[in-house]
Amino acid sequence: YFPTDMRFHFNGHNLVAYGRQGEDYLVSDPVIETAVTCLAGDLRRARFAKGPFAPRGLVYYPEHVPADPDLKAATRDAIHQTAKRMTGLPIPFFGVRGIRSLATRLERWPEKLGTEQARKWVSSVVRMQEEIGTGGAGFRFMYAAFLQEAAELLKMPVLEEVARDLTATGDRWRDFAVQGAQLVKNKRDDSEAYAKLAAVLRECADREQEIFTRLKSIV
């Protein structure tokens, strides 16, 4: 069901199979705007695709759905866990440390890789965050919307303030994507453009360090 121009090998994709009609599965896919159907054989091929980080048929499913879930406790725990992971992981590939690490690496790409390869890598970063969904502005907007709902559920107006700050940070992530796309299209040897991109990333990291540290103290 993927359009031809969106077909490329990526083993980190997730989707929801919510029903079945004969040999077709009813699927909700995050990159497709409407529900779609997928033949059992096609879905099986995708689930057992080869390559790096092969999914090996991995499936998540609920074993028990409580009749009256404690959404307040779950929301608090979710916020705390996200804030902890964004600010406290020791590995410099995730969270705020990961953002700063990317900024440092990106700034060196022209010298290390050459301008042509550096542009390709910037293009890959922008595509990953804007189209594939591994970060960037969209995730910040989504999480800000979640915080707005959490503010109402938990009766904590302060979460509305944090949501506004995170939305503003999402705007800066979108600026990064736009500037990155312009760099790729210009095809000029402009090391200053890479420094500017890195500066936007560091600004986003600083903002998110403050935002998620604040969230840890709130919940």
Positions of predicted regions on the chain:
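Active-site-adjacent substructure of cysteine-protease-like catalytic cores
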Residues: 1-29, 219
